[in-house]
């Protein structure tokens, strides 16, 4: 920057992409947070089928980045990937709005399940490609800022400045996502309950159109990766596997220092620029063929190792994702049976309680940054206060406490319902009793979800950044499938013993969601203990960097 002036805040491109991410969350939460109510009340699905449908749809939505990321990292231009996927997202929302409109105009009040599933699939496909590409594109803007702003930094301060700016970016990104989620859950749930589903789905559709417009408005401020220098990590992986199988290329991995050097070489391979980088392009093209071949095989093997070593921690995070499926499904169904009146004329829409998760994040994030982290820095002598792995572990523990509280509240609700013999699906227990479990999930979100984003961002090569974000979202995708499978297995087993034993009975006075919550708490506790053991033996790349700095 001119005169060596150092910019403290985020660039215009980063800020614009954070706003765009917030709008996307507003549209998504406006549909997803109350979808189970739409499926049970309008489409007339059973509780278990509606929950399974929502979980399966969420699973596809969060799993698709795993399949799109290799193409986005190796072949697709991120700008046009974002534009195409957001357009597909918009078309899906248009279709969903049409299903609500057709249902409201039909004399039989029936909705075509085929058209409904097609619309939801288009939304899932668009979102599955959009989210990791948008985050990776934002990280590209951040890298450009760091590379240029830190040219004037002393080398001893460079690492700490970069670390703090990365943390700032992820926290502001998550703040934008939370703000959009909060508006989507509160405003849209009220509109859907009060004015109907046509308007309730039309507003998120209009929001996606606004997102596309704003994204195009930023063309002049974005920085782009040079397409001639775009790394193709997955192509290298396939090449090295082919060479290994055919026995045509024998590669020897030397030591950890060589691996670190190769990773630095990979990072320098993909500059970000506002124009073509002729010098860098010439340098890359002038590399000898033997060197290119060696680098291709070498980095391919190391990339496979980097991905496989993340698998144990990725697996242990799945039960956290299963717990996080509950607010949009069974927590909402719980709230529909409870006393929701505030005054004589207003009823709390059950889906709006999901906003307390987001409110908890927004209100407590400053406490986390300004009070908790400085205290932790003094106690641990760590520049971040607590490590990313510790941050994720704390959130996992809090999510277990939240689901235990949910089980206790549900058991109390059932007990009061049976004692007072109330009307089915209408209990005198206030819906506000559900607040503690929502708030605790919000606090756990601050620790685990932000920690997951930073963890997978930091542990993959820069040329596979979209894949890093895809690994983060895939935790929730597979977690959704696990949740759907659990519901199907439990319902099959419990319903075979008679209607009164069905944990997911449509009559909430007969359902045993408390038993389901206890099962989730038990399995999550086992997963948490295994996570602790795995983390003790896991050596992160940041640890390697710290050791390298010490040796130097």
Swiss-Prot record:
Pfam families: PTR2. Belongs to the major facilitator superfamily. Proton-dependent oligopeptide transporter (POT/PTR) (TC 2.A.17) family. It is a multi-pass membrane protein. It comes from Arabidopsis thaliana. This is Protein NRT1/ PTR FAMILY 5.8. One of its GO terms (biological process) is response to nematode. Induction: Down-regulated upon nematode infection. GO terms for molecular function: dipeptide transmembrane transporter activity; tripeptide transmembrane transporter activity.
